Amino acid sequence: MKKKILLTCLFVFAIFLSSWLTRNYISDSDFKKLPESVKMAFYIEKYSILYNIPKNIAYGVPYYETSYRGTNDTNYNPKRISKHKAYGAMQIKLATANGISDTTITKKELLNNTELNVILSYKLLKKLYDKYGNWKLAVGAYNTGKPIVNKYAKLVCKFDLKKIDNSENIISYAVKD
């Protein structure tokens, strides 16, 4: 039994190492030539591991936000702007991006830099998960805004909002009270 577990772990590590090495051996110019859907899958895999985002959430958010359907999605266009002024592959608002980033982010960067868009998205999702303690509320807050999720959590889930630092303004810009 221990051998099976060890072999499985080694196999998973070998796959991870292989994908990491493959990316490192592809030149930046060759990587830029890849279809957007392939680059998006790479970013999802890389940053979901870094921020400990479950795969169903990691792929579900771009599926919902910009209709991402995987590496074979030949029509995928991550450069979208919503009617609510959310930008790029993961539909991040500028105020959110600047609230969770260490540097000032521009609309152009959010729209044209898919990697940055994914990083900021997963960083936000991780913060929301740490705050709410469950992925359902974290994804709800990501999608609809903190005030609505706080109301839902208080009324429906009997969630202890006293544990939440209400002075934190991660996404309160999303929905005006």
Feature locations, PLM:
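Hydrophobic membrane-insertion alpha-helices, especially the h-region
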Residues: 7-19
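Catalytic glycan-binding domains that act on GlcNAc-containing polysaccharides
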Residues: 23-177
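Positively charged n-region of N-terminal signal peptides that target proteins for export
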Residues: 1-4
